[in-house]
From Swiss-Prot:
GO terms for biological process: L-histidine biosynthetic process. In the N-terminal section; belongs to the PRA-CH family. InterPro entries: His_synth_HisIE, HisE, PRib-ATP_PPHydrolase-like, PRib_AMP_CycHydrolase_dom, PRib_AMP_CycHydrolase_sf. Its main location: cytoplasm. It comes from Shigella flexneri. This is Histidine biosynthesis bifunctional protein HisIE.
Amino acid sequence: MLTEQQRRELDWEKTDGLMPVIVQHAVSGEVLMLGYMNPEALDKTIESGKVTFFSRTKQRLWIKGETSGNFLNVVSIAPDCDNDTLLVLANPIGPTCHKGTSSCFGNTAHQWLFLYQLEQLLAERKYADPETSYTAKLYASGTKRIAQKVGEEGVETALAATVHDRFELTNEASDLMYHLLVLLQDQDLDLTTVIENLHKRHQ
């Protein structure tokens, strides 16, 4: 969240009391929407942990999702270099746009977003009836079986690469990625944790 010093340095006069706020998906990086906050809306956002704007049409505060239930849960807030715009990283609950899309800017999602969506689906399957899907049955088989599948798919991926079969390599790599995501979910880990660890190693 914003530090006290950052909050004091925000240039509300420059923006006539309404500061533009860009909301970005905290995991995928997709730009979700643009809104406006006055000081009260910012305070409410920080206090509640849910993105709250000042509606220029209704002339009041409104919590994004107060009607639809599609809230934006705040992860972090940062000012730009001129202190007249805010960037909010958030985890959306449902689609952000009233048209039912993930972003108010249309289909702007990077292909990486699919991995996040797949991860969410795999998390839902974790407690599903094993008879309803392969994934649910895999979870029910236990960690050892899931780990075994990751090992098998890893070997098959490597073998496909050694014979330079790009088509088969793509298929086997897809299977490996899927089973690895299932294993991470089984251990209550996610891609974000892995990515953060890679960032630390890179520094």
